[in-house]
Regions:
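Conserved PLP-enzyme active-site core in the AAT-like
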Residues: 1-202, 219
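Conserved C-terminal alpha-helix-loop-beta "cap" of PLP-dependent enzymes
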Residues: 188-233
Length: 233
């Protein structure tokens, strides 16, 4: 069972393994009160449970959270539903490797996910390609290593691995304080953008350091707005 907001690599994996996905709809925001009009909202716990109720033989539920725009699914509620149906919850947390640096539980592994993939290079200071796979059950480790041997390179980049270690060391040194300051700044900018009439992400759960602004209601495109910013330094 997968939400339609998944990454194309997951679709490719399903094709290679011959998996038959059951899609969970992710309706787009239709009103500014919901968020940026036209952007798909995260899958709801209710839609996931409806799919599980109809497909009780599902091997897993696959969710992307947070998405590219910073919108986050209710992972805690979805995890509770998945486990009630004896189904694994897999979370693509590519844009959320930093979420465990906040005092409130926000990382999928803190909220009940069974497997979770983080891209360390998106929001942490690591080289492109640095990633981590988290497992709630240590017994999954051998199967995960076998799968990685099939789909991964036999000549990994030691520079990437070193950058991952250095990024984690840096986050342990002052990551919590740095992320807290950044989240406060983003919160202030969201307020300024909203007061000026811009559409912003308004989902109940959202990435504290992601600032996504819609420009359609202002009569310009993101490209035009970007050029306007560049001209003003």
């Amino acid at each position: 069972i997968a939400a339609r907001t998944l990454h194309r690599s997951a679709v490719a994996m399903m094709g290679l393994l011959g998996l038959d996905p059951v899609w969970v709809s992710c309706p787009a925001a239709s009103r500014e009160e919901e968020g940026i009009v036209g952007i798909c909202l995260p899958p709801s716990p209710q839609s996931v449970e409806a799919a599980l109720r109809e497909h009780r033989d599902a091997a897993a539920v696959y969710i992307t959270s947070p998405d590219y725009f910073g919108q986050m699914a209710d992972i805690a509620a979805i995890a509770e539903i998945c486990h009630r149906y004896s189904t694994l919850l897999l979370v693509d947390n590519a844009h959320g490797a930093h979420l465990n640096l906040f005092r409130a539980a926000m990382h999928p592994m803190q909220l009940g996910a069974d497997l979770c993939a983080d891209s360390l290079h998106k929001n942490l200071p690591a080289l492109t390609g640095a990633a981590a796979l988290h497992m709630a059950d240590p017994d999954m480790r051998e199967e995960a290593l076998y799968a990685m041997s099939l789909f991964g390179s036999s000549s990994p980049s030691y520079l990437i691995m070193l950058s991952a270690d250095m990024a984690l060391e840096q986050m342990e040194g002052g990551g919590v304080e740095g992320m807290t300051r950044l989240a406060q700044w983003v919160h202030e900018q969201k307020g300024r953008a909203a007061r000026r009439g811009y559409q912003i992400v308004r989902t109940f759960l959202c990435d504290p350091i992601r600032l996504t602004v819609g420009f359609a209601s202002m009569g310009c495109t993101a490209r035009q707005f970007g050029e306007w910013i560049r001209l003003r330094g």
